[in-house]
Amino acid sequence: MNKTNQLINICILVTLFLIGSSSALTLQVEPKSQECFYNFIESGKTSLLLYQVIRGGLLDINVKLTDPKGNTIFERLHFDTQMKGKQSFTAGESGAYKVCFNNEMSRFTAKVVTFTWASEEEGVKEVAKGDSITPMDQSVQKIERVLQSVIHEQKKLRYREQANRDTSESTNARVVWWTIAEVIVLVVMGVGQIWYLRKWFDNKSTGRV
């Protein structure tokens, strides 16, 4: 019974880690600009940054993460079609960590980025009682990693679906406007032909008189 209660408590803590300490944000990074966000992380805590470019150009963005002193933890030019946007790290000191999404390399195209920045909650590392981690704790940690991956993939699919829907709606709108333009051109041409024929017959009638 104790093991069952321990497993329940661990699962609750894992759930809090997954859904209580992170929030998904979606933003548009305009051309020749960057957007930065801060997250206060305590020393020794593990943090996970998940990000994805869902619309714009080649689905590329420059990502840079810095510590409270401004030192670069990692920086890369991310292509969403070539790699997963995922970076985990352990905070070396307490303070405000900063992530920046830079689109300065693009002159005309804005990029739509969605990201989740999750930080480890108090107690997650202290789940196991005693000095050693039990097989049950190891299983729960494995489940935690799997759940994180599943949640990330679900969000990726959802945002990709939204991007495809936006593209489809935009295409449909262009088709509608193109059809309207064609109708207007046909009407103008028809009116012009009728006017020309009437004028031609009027000239013929005048010539006979």
From Swiss-Prot:
Segments crossing the lipid bilayer: 175-195
Topology, Lumenal side: 25-174
Gene Ontology biological process terms in this record: endoplasmic reticulum to Golgi vesicle-mediated transport; Golgi organization; intracellular protein transport
Subcellular location: Cytoplasmic vesicle membrane
Gene Ontology CC annotation, any one: COPII-coated ER to Golgi transport vesicle
Listed Pfam families: EMP24_GP25L
Signal peptide limits: 1-24
Domain GOLD: from-to ranges: 34-119
UniProt KW keywords: Cytoplasmic vesicle, Membrane, Protein transport, Signal, Transmembrane, Transmembrane helix, Transport
Membrane topology, as annotated: Single-pass type I membrane protein
Cytoplasmic-side positions: 196-209
Protein family according to the UniProt entry: Belongs to the EMP24/GP25L family.
Classification via PANTHER family: TRANSMEMBRANE EMP24 DOMAIN-CONTAINING PROTEIN
Function: Could have a role in the budding of coatomer-coated and other species of coated vesicles.
Protein name: Transmembrane emp24 domain-containing protein B
Species annotation: Dictyostelium discoideum
Phylogenetic placement of the source organism: Eukaryota, Amoebozoa, Evosea, Eumycetozoa, Dictyostelia
Chain's gene name: empB
